Amino acid sequence: MSSKSFWSDLAAQWPIAALAPMDGYCDSPYRRVMKRVAPDIITFAEFYSADGLVHSKTLADTVLPHEADEKPVIFQIFGKDPDMFAKAAVMIERSGAAWVDINMGCPAKKVVKSGHGSSLMINRDTAFRIVEEMSKAVSIPVSVKTRLGWENPELLKDFCLWLQNAGANLITVHARTYKQAFTGKADWSALFDLKRHLSIPVIGNGDVLDYDDGVKRIQESTWLGSGDTVLDGFMIGRSTFGNPWSFLPWHVRPTLREILAIMRLHGDLLWERKWRKWMLEARKHLVQYLHGFPGVKIYRQALVTVETPEMIHTVLDMIAHEHQLILDTIPDDGSSSSQMEAWRSCDIACD
């Protein structure tokens, strides 16, 4: 797919709604589950070391293959060597990925100490060379995910203009500084001035709860009380844990039957893709779907001991049987603070 056709197709889908790259979560099964519920979203994979992909055939063969039903997929890579970034980008392009993204925003101390992630915001010459070398090496779009700045957003505009001039096709900004990491509230107000100065798409990230919240956050008037600048899209991250429905508009709430079906699918996809590592992955992911659910302690204990897909099916069938009166109940209109509280109300009403 050419950059031109990709971006024209993407522009027609405004707003761009994307699954944020999250280490330990955004593997192929997770991306496929998200796309099953919300087919129009874009999914980012977990971020991988550029050096690791180049030097480890095992890693590349494990993480780069992806299925047709999860496309378009974006692979994010981190590192500090422009040559390694270019070589890894070529591998990603050959895998059939839609585009390749550069991590210039991870605030983890180990990452930054190594000269990766957020440290590239203050090692600008290296950052620009990385974008230039990658843009020369591949025909797919090259994008950057960064932060407001190291300590404040004063230099954000200049930094992103240089990234654009170096060849970046899209910029995503997590609306916190490196110093903030994940503390405090994300402040999107600086992103709109950035958007006015760039000719490439700008996506916002940070504290997005769901699709409707994302649409609200990308509008300047939400933050400044006036103004008509609108960002091109948003990312949702941690709010997707156990909740792929967060990508659906109008605060759609799934029925219990729908959630159990997605849990079954997620478990089966993990088994299909990971096999030996399946148990630990399944336990981590599946319990997220039942956070706060009535009787969750018993179900969680059952799920963390499963060893086969059939054992998961047994647990899910047990949940369906014990809550059959609310299997197809549509929870309330959103007045409850969570999906599970809404079910709890239904459960009590049906007793």
Task: Name each region found by the language model.
Residues M1-A18, D23, P29, R129-E132, ...:
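Alpha/beta catalytic cores of nucleotide-metabolism and tRNA/nucleoside-modifying enzymes
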Residues S2-A11, M22-S95:
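Glycine-rich, positively charged N-terminal anion/phosphate-binding segment
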Residues Q13-I16, D51-P72, C106, V112-S114, ...:
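N-terminal small/glycine-rich loop or linker at the start of catalytic domains
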Residues A18, T43-F44, I74-Q76, D101, ...:
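Conserved beta-strand positions in the central sheet of alpha/beta enzyme cores
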Residues M22-G24, Y48-A50, F78-K80, G105-P107, ...:
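Active-site beta-loop-alpha junctions enriched in small/polar residues
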Residues V33-R36, A86-H116, D125-I200, S226-T229:
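Alpha/beta enzyme core
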Residues A60, G115-M121, W250-R253:
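Short glycine-enriched, charge-decorated loop/helix-capping segments at active-site entrances
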